[in-house]
Regions:
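Conserved, structured core segments of small domains
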Residues: 1-143
Length: 143
């Protein structure tokens, strides 16, 4: 099973030019090495503050671009991992080991696999999507 592990932003992570704690960065590096060694990580990255981002809102066939920053830090994302683990319990156990600084929140969400769409897609459609996904860089077919 694949999961997206979402590190929620904080007021500190949303500050422009925020200086990260060197000790926390060292601990996070070691944690990431453990995840990689265990074969859990498929992708991972941290994100710049929302002040460097935009939102594109769609309504009635048109779109509007809204520049950051965005005010509700608790609704923003500071970083993420994509993990492949046996189940959500394994993901939870890994998250519990995550080094954090102060108050933090991490959300775990299961990623759809092709077989999840079996009730609405034909086998041919699923195979086509699996083949297209395999063409993406750093991707494996998920069927």
């Amino acid at each position: 099973m694949r999961f997206m592990v979402i590190v929620k932003a904080s007021p500190e992570s949303e500050k422009e030019g925020a200086v990260h704690d060197p000790q926390l960065l060292l601990e996070m590096g070691k944690y990431n090495e453990e995840l990689i060694k265990a074969g859990v990580v498929l992708a991972m990255d941290g994100l710049h503050p929302s002040s460097k981002g935009v939102r594109v809102k769609f309504s009635g066939g048109s779109h509007t671009v809204v520049d950051g920053p965005f005010t509700e830090a608790k609704e923003l994302i500071a970083g993420f991992w994509i993990w492949k683990v046996r189940n959500i319990d394994e993901a939870i156990e890994w998250v519990k080991r995550c080094p954090v600084d102060g108050d933090s929140e991490v959300e775990i969400r299961q990623i759809f696999e092709m077989e999840d769409f079996a009730p609405v897609l034909t086998e041919e459609q699923i195979q086509h999507k699996v083949a297209k996904r395999a063409e993406l860089p750093n991707q494996t077919a998920n069927k």
